[in-house]
């Protein structure tokens, strides 16, 4: 985007693909380095630690995380291209097996084969080509911290806060003006912590609000309307941007009414690096 703004390039095709489901899993078969000493061999272990810390600090109920999983599956069930289209009830979520306690199976994202691509261009170029469906980028932020989860000063405050602050400042809008959020949902706890890091609720209150007021298109915060990583596809990143663009064009399978601004999050590691994107309505 900066290269386009600087006039260095006119267009950029951004692509991603992965075979996480059918490809080699050799890198996950045994722990390495310091993680091996502690018997910690998966990304999920880091998130389980964060999930446990969240429950302990805020006395969070299992139903709070279930509200995230149920909303994602409800949206995925209405998406004909979603990998996981079976609806999930809160009772079924609570009855699900633990994989890495306190995380249950439905707290964890899918493993998927897939790919995605977006075309990035300048406003002038889009106008010259007569593209009235182009979705404008209003704000972008990025921040990161220690890769090692145990070295962070606070497990429940990620660099999502700094990333969002930059993006909202660039966009020049308030948090309550957001029409929907496409949040990186590798695990349900990630969604609750991102909501709080973004300043959409006070600390420790995202789960209760999600349970009471909903994350569907008619709820408090329409969330991951394609099903996200929990239901549509575990192929991370670009699909959330694509769904945000569809929403802002009025082309989504589960459509928010008259959206003006869309919020997208992305991250890597165990909440190690974070990016925030704010998009505006097409046209």
Question: Language-model segments: which ranges?
Answer:
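Conserved beta-ketoacyl condensing-enzyme motif
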Residues: 1-27, 175-197, 263
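Extended C-terminal subregions enriched in glycine
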Residues: 157, 161, 165-188, 197, ...
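Short glycine/threonine-rich loop-to-helix capping motif typified by GTGT followed
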Residues: 147-153, 185-208, 219, 270-278
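Acidic, glycine-rich active-site loops and adjacent beta-strand->loop/helix elements
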Residues: 16-21, 71-72, 141-144, 184-188, ...
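Conserved catalytic cysteine-centered active-site region
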Residues: 1-47, 84-110, 140-145, 158-159, ...
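Phosphate/pyrophosphate-binding loops at sites that engage ATP/ADP/AMP, CoA/4′-phosphopantetheine
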Residues: 54-59, 127, 163-177, 252
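Condensing-enzyme catalytic core mediating Claisen C-C bond formation in acyl metabolism
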Residues: 66-67, 98-162, 166, 212-226, ...
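Active-site-proximal alpha-helical scaffold in enzymes
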Residues: 1-18, 44-78, 118-124, 232-252
């Amino acid at each position: 985007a900066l290269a386009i703004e600087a006039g260095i390039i006119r267009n950029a095709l951004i692509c991603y693909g992965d075979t996480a489901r059918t490809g080699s899993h050799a890198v996950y078969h045994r722990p390495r380095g310091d993680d091996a000493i502690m018997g910690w061999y998966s990304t999920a272990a880091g998130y389980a630690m964060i999930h446990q810390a969240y429950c302990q600090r805020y006395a969070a109920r299992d139903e709070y995380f279930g509200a995230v999983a149920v909303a994602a599956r409800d949206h995925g069930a209405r998406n004909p291209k979603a990998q996981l289209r079976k609806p999930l009830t809160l009772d079924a979520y609570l009855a699900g097996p633990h994989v890495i306690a306190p995380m249950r199976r439905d707290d964890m994202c899918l493993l998927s084969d897939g790919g995605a691509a977006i075309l990035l261009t300048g406003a002038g170029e889009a106008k010259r080509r007569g593209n009235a469906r182009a979705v404008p980028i209003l704000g972008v932020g990025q921040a990161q911290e220690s890769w090692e989860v145990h070295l962070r000063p606070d497990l429940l405050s990620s660099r999502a806060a700094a990333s969002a602050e930059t993006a909202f400042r660039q966009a020049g809008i308030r948090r309550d003006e957001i029409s929907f959020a496409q949040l990186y949902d590798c695990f349900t706890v990630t969604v609750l912590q991102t909501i709080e890091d973004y300043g959409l609720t006070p600390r420790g209150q995202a789960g209760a609000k999600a349970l009471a007021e909903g994350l569907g298109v008619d709820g408090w915060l329409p969330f991951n309307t394609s099903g996200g990583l929990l239901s549509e596809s575990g192929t991370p990143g670009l699909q959330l941007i694509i769904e945000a663009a569809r929403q802002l064009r009025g082309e989504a399978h589960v459509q928010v009414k008259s959206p003006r601004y869309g919020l997208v999050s992305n991250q890597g590691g165990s909440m190690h690096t974070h990016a925030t994107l704010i998009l505006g309505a097409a046209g």
